[in-house]
């Protein structure tokens, strides 16, 4: 791999782009979404942040950037400190401001999750994301105004207390973070609550969704969404054994 390639950038429909950390393994890296507006742009989740992401983004867009994290886990919020305008839910504001390996679940990441280290002496087993105090607290019903488009904040707790999604009604697009993706759903973490997680998934079904851009894996539509939710409810996509659910 070219040592200079730290992020890949792929344009999708509706002025949305997918950014990926090229040196983080596919099974661990999160999807970083770039939503372009007429007056400002939105970055949804920021990855591990082991490499400078803002330099690449500012070469692509000259508009002001809002960086919003769907939750405070290290693989989504590690790069948040690189941005001046930082949005997140109040339930996890203390984690963003005072992160530890335990509170951000960085104690789960292993050396094999990195294809290449940011520098030779780097030890992922000791790494913790930088503090990133939230400048813009967002809650259920708040609207992120990008000029020619708006995204509504939805609170979907369960995976974590402050997990949020973003809904663009005009295009039927939902950004779900770790509330829903095509994989085994993490409902076993220290602040996960499976029963609340289920309620959030039932609520997700109510939206007239065309496309889900998730926190991990490929994007998908409503039919696939319903299959994933049904499989989770039956225990197939849960990290917990039946007695724990």
PLM regions and their residue ranges:
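Short histidine/acidic/glycine/proline-rich micro-motifs that form metal-
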Residues: 25, 92-93, 218-220
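Active-site HxH/HxHxD metal-binding segment of metal-dependent hydrolases
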Residues: 50-143, 224, 230-242
């Amino acid at each position: 791999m070219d040592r200079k390639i730290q992020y890949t950038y792929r344009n999708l429909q509706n002025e949305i782009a997918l950014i990926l950390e090229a040196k983080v393994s596919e099974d661990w890296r999160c999807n970083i979404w770039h939503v372009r507006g007429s007056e400002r742009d939105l970055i949804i989740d920021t990855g591990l942040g082991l490499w400078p992401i803002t330099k690449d983004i500012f070469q692509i867009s000259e508009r002001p950037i809002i960086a919003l994290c769907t939750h405070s886990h290290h693989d989504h919020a590690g790069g948040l400190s690189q941005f001046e305008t930082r949005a997140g839910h109040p339930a996890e504001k203390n984690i963003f401001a005072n992160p530890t390996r335990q509170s951000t679940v960085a104690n789960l990441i292993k050396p094999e999750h990195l294809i290449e280290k940011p520098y030779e002496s780097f030890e992922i087993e000791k790494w913790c994301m930088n503090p990133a105090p939230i400048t813009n607290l967002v809650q259920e019903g708040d609207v992120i105004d990008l000029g020619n488009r708006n995204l509504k904040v939805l609170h979907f707790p369960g995976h974590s207390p402050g997990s949020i999604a973003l809904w663009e009604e005009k295009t039927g697009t939902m950004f779900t973070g770790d509330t829903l993706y095509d994989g085994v759903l993490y409902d076993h973490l220290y602040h996960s609550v499976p029963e609340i997680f289920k309620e959030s998934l039932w609520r997700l079904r109510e939206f007239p969704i065309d496309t889900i851009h998730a926190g991990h894996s490929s994007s998908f539509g409503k039919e696939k969404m319903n299959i994933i939710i049904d499989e989770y409810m039956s225990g197939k996509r849960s990290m917990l054994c039946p007695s724990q659910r």
